[in-house]
Regions:
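A short, proline-enriched helix->beta-strand linker immediately N-terminal to the Walker B motif
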Residues: 1-4
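Catalytic Walker B motif of ABC-type/P-loop ATPase nucleotide-binding domains
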Residues: 6-10, 15
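Helix N-cap at the start of a conserved alpha-helix in ABC-type nucleotide-binding domains
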Residues: 17-19
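Conserved catalytic loops of ABC-family nucleotide-binding domains
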Residues: 26-40
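A short, surface-exposed alpha-helical micro-motif characterized by mixed small hydrophobic
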Residues: 48-50
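ABC ATPase "signature
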Residues: 66-67
Length: 139
C-alpha cells in the first residue's frame, strides 16, 4: 500500500531551482489522486504557492492566517500610488504599506474595501506574507 499523507519539513530547501521544480512536480502528481495529501512546512513561499490548496502562516508563534490559497490571493491586492490616494481609502482597506522607490506608496489592500476602478496588482503569497509581517512589526 502507498501512503496517502506525506508530512514534509523544508522538503525543497537547498535544492537548485531545476531539481526543486522536478520535486514539486512529483508532489503535484502525488496529490492528483483525490485521497492523497501533503502537509508541508517551508520558507520557500513560491513552492507553497505552486503546490498548496491551503496555506497557514505562523510568525513568532502567532497564526497570521490559515485559508485557501486562492481565497487569500482574491482577498488582497497590491496598490501602487500616491500617499494621498492611499490616505483617501476607507478605514481597514490598507493592511500594510511601504514607501516605494519612486516616492509613492506601495501597499497591501483588501480588495473589497477599495473603490471599483482602482488598478490593483495581483499579489503573490510572498507579497501577502511580507506585508503582513511588516504590518505586525509596525503595530
Amino acid at each position: 500500500p502507498s501512503p496517502r499523507l506525506l508530512v514534509l519539513d523544508e522538503a525543497t530547501a537547498g535544492l537548485d531551482p531545476i531539481v526543486r521544480d522536478e520535486v514539486l512536480e512529483i508532489f503535484n502528481e502525488f496529490t492528483r489522486e483525490e485521497d492523497h495529501s501533503i502537509l508541508i512546512s517551508s520558507h520557500i513561499l513560491s513552492d507553497l504557492e505552486k503546490l498548496c490548496d491551503y496555506i497557514a502562516f505562523l510568525h513568532q508563534g502567532r497564526l497570521l492566517f490559515c485559508d485557501e490559497k486562492d481565497r487569500l490571493l482574491e482577498e488582497y491586492g497590491i496598490f501602487v500610488g500616491t500617499a494621498d490616494q492611499v490616505n483617501s481609502l476607507q478605514d481597514g482597506a490598507v493592511v500594510a504599506r511601504e514607501n516605494s522607490s519612486f516616492g509613492g506608496v506601495r501597499c497591501l489592500v483588501k480588495r473589497a474595501l477599495v473603490p471599483a476602478g482602482w488598478a490593483l496588482e495581483r499579489p503573490t503569497v510572498e507579497d501577502i506574507v511580507l506585508f503582513l509581517v511588516k504590518g505586525a512589526k509596525e503595530q
